[in-house]
Swiss-Prot record:
Gene name for this UniProt entry: psaC
Lineage: Bacteria, Bacillati, Cyanobacteriota, Cyanophyceae, Nostocales
Name of the protein: Photosystem I iron-sulfur center
Species name: Microchaete diplosiphon
Chain sites annotated for binding [4Fe-4S] cluster 2: C21, C48, C51, C54
Record-listed [4Fe-4S] cluster 1 binding positions: C11, C14, C17, C58
UniProtKB keywords: 4Fe-4S, Electron transport, Iron, Iron-sulfur, Membrane, Metal-binding, Oxidoreductase, Photosynthesis, Photosystem I, Repeat, Thylakoid, Transport
GO cellular component entries: photosystem I; plasma membrane-derived thylakoid membrane
Domain named 4Fe-4S ferredoxin-type: residues: 2-31, 39-68
């Protein structure tokens, strides 16, 4: 099941989300928009299990990474209307 993984430009390039992901959905890619000169990327969203460990690991005040669960997961969790 695929979930949407969004990475925002508030990413500081710390790699915490990449290390927290149990399914290797994330990787770091070069980016000049932050001091670390890298940003998280999500090239394998089809492997995302929706655990949101990446969100939990993010140290920025506004989460730089968000996982939006697919409709099937939301329904199975009783969150759908």
């Amino acid at each position: 099941m695929s979930h949407t993984v969004k990475i925002y430009d508030t990413c500081i390039g710390c790699t915490q989300c990449v290390r927290a992901c149990p399914t290797d959905v994330l990787e770091m890619v070069p980016w000049d928009g932050c001091k670390a000169a890298q940003i998280a990327s999500s090239p394998r969203t089809e492997d995302c299990v929706g655990c949101k460990r990446c969100e939990t690991a993010c140290p920025t005040d506004f989460l730089s990474i968000r996982v939006y669960l697919g409709a099937e997961t939301t329904r199975s969790m009783g969150l759908a209307y």
